[in-house]
Design a protein with these regions (language model features):
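ATP-binding Walker
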Residues: 11
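Conserved phosphate-donor/acceptor-positioning beta-strand/loop module used by diverse small-molecule
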Residues: 128-130, 147-202
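P-loop (Walker A) phosphate-binding loop of NTP-binding proteins
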Residues: 8
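Walker A/P-loop
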Residues: 14
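Conserved substrate/cofactor phosphate-moiety recognition/catalytic segment
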Residues: 21-76, 139
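NTP-dependent small-molecule kinase module
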Residues: 195-259
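Glycine-rich phosphate-binding loop used to anchor ATP phosphates in small-molecule kinases
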Residues: 65-161
């Protein structure tokens, strides 16, 4: 079985992954930013030619880049956020080669995701936010897609995944605002300066969705998260019936993991 761990930011995905990993020690864990057979968040996705160009540009990081790169046919996946360096502009430069945030066309976005899922035929994996979070977030905030368009996307993807062994563990937040407040504190530095929240809020405020709807600020972002959670659970019900479990965020029993 492959376990897809989903839920909003701050819902407790890391803790659930640890529990599943302990329960299934023979399963491989894939967290955000890791090389992942189906998900490309926090990774650059480039042609062989562009890859060689990047190696030439960052000669001093050649070994580190090669160690964090993976070949997929004519493409290369670079897990650049896993490379610790103080080389100016390196991470910002490679960020442009991600597939999210309108960096590729809608058509290429869909093709890349579907192609990787079609080729995926593995078992015994635990995957963090590899099915919903980044795709749904992108389609809402950057493609300005309607709920129906997103459901249509997943209806097609569901057919691709019909014969694959998977179960979705969805962490549902009963109080989204409270959960966000918790991670605001957790993701602050030693002086109490918030590190994550200002970046997330800026990301939301600058998105095509926010600009098109004339919204911004914390309340609007929370409203977006509430909507996203409702939509993701609807996808579970309509596209993946019998293949998901909804757990109360940070308030479930270990026995509920037995499916």
């Amino acid at each position: 079985m492959n376990w897809f761990v989903e839920g909003l930011q701050g819902s407790g995905k890391s803790t659930l992954i640890e529990k599943l990993s302990g329960k299934y020690p023979d399963h491989q864990v894939f967290r955000e930013g890791d090389y992942n057979p189906v998900e490309l968040a926090w990774c650059a996705y480039v042609s062989k030619e562009k890859y060689e160009e990047i190696l030439d540009t960052y000669k001093e990081l050649r070994q580190e880049i090669e160690e964090k790169s993976y070949e997929e046919g004519s493409r290369r996946v670079i897990c650049y956020t896993k490379i610790i360096t103080d080389v100016p502009g390196f991470h910002k430069d490679l960020e442009q080669y991600e597939i999210y945030n309108n960096r590729v066309s809608k058509e290429d976005f869909k093709r890349i995701i579907f192609d990787r899922y079609r080729k995926w035929n593995s078992d015994k994996m635990i995957l963090e936010c590899s099915l919903f979070q980044n795709i749904v977030e992108d389609m809402i905030l950057f493609q300005n897609a309607s709920d129906q368009e997103i459901l249509g996307f997943y209806e097609e993807l569901g057919k691709v995944l019909a014969d694959k062994k998977l179960h979705i563990m969805y962490l549902a937040s009963e109080d989204v605002a409270a959960n966000i407040n918790v991670i605001r504190k957790e993701r602050s530095d030693d002086q109490g300066n918030e590190m994550w929240f200002p970046l997330m809020l800026g990301f939301f405020n600058e998105s095509p969705f926010a600009k098109a709807h004339g919204v911004s600020g914390e309340d609007a972002m929370i409203e977006h998260f509430v909507h996203r959670q409702e939509l993701e659970q609807r996808i579970c019900r309509e596209i993946f019936p019998g293949r998901y479990t909804v757990l109360k965020s940070k308030n479930y029993e270990d026995s509920e993991l037995d499916v």
